[in-house]
């Protein structure tokens, strides 16, 4: 029984779910917004916000060793050095004073082919 197991499963087994979340996170870093199903958007929001928190901590790190360790953790999640640098050096500085809530989900209606509920997930940009 799955009582009190609150992980977003998105209809996939473990390694497939991790790969999906990794790919969606990479797309968010690269394009700052993506359109996906609402369930996947909610799952990737949780995953990506943890990465964003690590990126902000890496940017604020006083010791070089701590920054390198956090960058390696982000690399483990994203798998691309270029995206790690973009996240830590370009995106994270915009959110240094923000305590979470780095992404927002907006519903955009049903998908044409099968009627699945689609959502836009994007980085929140403060002016």
Curated annotation (Swiss-Prot):
One of its GO terms (molecular function) is structural constituent of ribosome. Keywords: Ribonucleoprotein, Ribosomal protein. One of its GO terms (biological process) is translation. One of its GO terms (cellular component) is cytosolic large ribosomal subunit. Pfam families: Ribosomal_L17 (PF01196). It comes from the Bacteria. InterPro entries: Ribosomal_bL17, Ribosomal_bL17_sf. Part of the 50S ribosomal subunit. Contacts protein L32. Belongs to the bacterial ribosomal protein bL17 family. This is Large ribosomal subunit protein bL17. The gene is rplQ.
